[in-house]
Amino acid sequence: MRLSEFHLHTTKEIPADAELVSHRLMLRAGMIRKLASGLYTWSPLGLRVLRKVEAIVRDEMNRAGAVEMLLPTIQPRELWEESERWEKFGSQLLKIKDRKQAEYCYSPTAEEAVTDYVRQELTSYKQLPVNLYQIQTKFRDEIRPRFGVMRAREFVMKDAYSFHLNDADLVREYENMRATYTRIFTRLGLEFRAVQADSGAIGGDASQEFHVIADSGEDVLAFSTGSDYAANIEAAIAATPGPRLTANETLQKVSTPTQKRCEDVAALLDIPLQRVVKSIAVMTDSGFFLALLRGDHTLNDIKLSKLPGLANFRLANEVEIARHLGSEPGFLGPVCPGMPIRIIADCEVAVMADFVVGANEVGFHLVGVNWGRDLPEPEVVADIRNVIEGDRAVDGGKICIARGIEVGHVFQLGRKYAEAMKATVLDEYGKAVTMTMGCYGIGVSRIVAAAIEQNHDVAGIIWPAPIAPWQVAVCVINPKKDPVITAAAEMLLAELQSADVDTVLDDRGLRPGVMFADMELIGIPHRIVVSERGLAAGTYEYRARRTAMVENLDKTTLLTRIKA
């Protein structure tokens, strides 16, 4: 490939609405161009990267035994009404009418279409299991498209659907797909974590998300240094605390005139924040509760809502707080002699001793508080907090916190769609059996942006080698000055290509600084400079994009380095 024959248009301009690094760099590198809100044109450069991601995904899906197909993106209303998602999916479902006023949607997922195909094609248990996948353009009518292709309305996705006679076989394929996804993201050269997740609008039972680790990620992840344990912060758990500490202090009321925050109380009293307990007033279907957390912890709404009777909890307002405690936020506490308060204590709080709480009196806190003596044992003890960096993990390791970008999701759907759409086969006894399903998605176009979020510097993109547009850029200095320089570059290009090294020759005749800046911006892993001075010395200048290391190497050493 020669850049003089390739459309490459880089720019230094950054649109004001480009918030993420990946969005800015993809625009600057000329990988994408905005057509309309949430709609992007992929340039030849961008498409090279997208196709490389697709190729790895396709190769591993085929290796795993899945079979590729292609489903229509425009799907009839009747199918989506069978699954009851025509209305339930909400405003993200783009609905259209043809000239006959028949209604369709531009599909964001393809459960209905693939189930319709399978119920027509499969009749016997002998045809199961089957795993069908496609790499196809999808559409979600996002209310606020942003972040470039990270959250575009139109996107490229690999979606796979497996069909099984029973749940045991579904679990087997689910594990097969989990292992396949691990191979895919490993081959893509990305740092990632697989985490337990919620199935969301698609539905189903067990599910797991795959996240690329990046500071700009929308999701907060917790993972252990001791094993492959990882979870979304909402679902992450820490090891159970040890036995309750021994009480040594007497109860005292202290003045905290303006200190409402736990941090301020700890600073005033010159004690660790971990000794302060925050009281969060909540209203439930059965009344008023105080949820108690350590001062350095935060409430996990999802964990709290899963406790019996708390599915519809909400934070109490100031009127309700005053009615039940006679106080105001910032000074609330569970010590209420003669006025029993229902308490939900986080597991960590339940084993504390000599702790500090609000006195239910404006301007005062209580110190030296202990269970059983100053207040009754909590009605409920449960894990209701978010884990934090450094917590002891259930496997004995330490909890680490990072942000992640979701790029893959696997589900055990069960029979949700098959039952709704009457997708059955005959079993060995001739009885009609409803098939059970799995669903496995990868955001192909999103991976491109996520890879950039994880791999970049001030100069531009640093592609993982497997998905770089080219592995090597051969840059020619003053190609018109001496035909020997051009001939040497052409020979090097031919040798690299014959060794199956994806190489581009920058023969545009630009100034070296401009040429080098372009190669750094578009993230080519290896740069080789062919110059008059180098040829005179029998060397080529080599620069590794990731390490920025520059060396002058002879051709034999250079080719060995590139092929390694």
Swiss-Prot record:
EC numbers, comma separated: 6.1.1.15
InterPro entries from the UniProt entry: aa-tRNA-synt_IIb (IPR002314), aa-tRNA-synth_II (IPR006195), aa-tRNA-synth_II/BPL/LPL (IPR045864), Anticodon-bd (IPR004154), Anticodon-bd_dom_sf (IPR036621), Pro-tRNA-ligase_IIa (IPR002316), Pro-tRNA-synth_IIa_bac-type (IPR004500), Pro-tRNA-Synthase_IIa_type1 (IPR023717)
GO molecular function terms noted in the UniProt entry: aminoacyl-tRNA deacylase activity; ATP binding; proline-tRNA ligase activity
Reaction(s) catalysed by this chain's protein: tRNA(Pro) + L-proline + ATP = L-prolyl-tRNA(Pro) + AMP + diphosphate
Major site of localization recorded for this protein: cytoplasm
GO CC annotations, alphabetized: cytosol
GO biological process, one term: prolyl-tRNA aminoacylation
Location within or outside the cell: Cytoplasm
UniProt keyword annotations, A-Z: Aminoacyl-tRNA synthetase, ATP-binding, Cytoplasm, Ligase, Nucleotide-binding, Protein biosynthesis
PANTHER family hit by this protein: MITOCHONDRIAL RIBOSOME PROTEIN L39/PROLYL-TRNA LIGASE FAMILY MEMBER, PROLINE--TRNA LIGASE
Domain notes: Consists of three domains: the N-terminal catalytic domain, the editing domain and the C-terminal anticodon-binding domain.
HAMAP family to which the protein is assigned, alphabetical: Pro_tRNA_synth_type1
Function: Catalyzes the attachment of proline to tRNA(Pro) in a two-step reaction: proline is first activated by ATP to form Pro-AMP and then transferred to the acceptor end of tRNA(Pro). As ProRS can inadvertently accommodate and process non-cognate amino acids such as alanine and cysteine, to avoid such errors it has two additional distinct editing activities against alanine. One activity is designated as 'pretransfer' editing and involves the tRNA(Pro)-independent hydrolysis of activated Ala-AMP.
NCBIfam families: PRK09194.1, proS_fam_II
Quaternary structure annotation from Swiss-Prot or TrEMBL: Homodimer.
Family to which this protein belongs: Belongs to the class-II aminoacyl-tRNA synthetase family. ProS type 1 subfamily.
The protein's name: Proline--tRNA ligase
Taxon lineage: Bacteria, Pseudomonadati, Pseudomonadota, Gammaproteobacteria, Lysobacterales
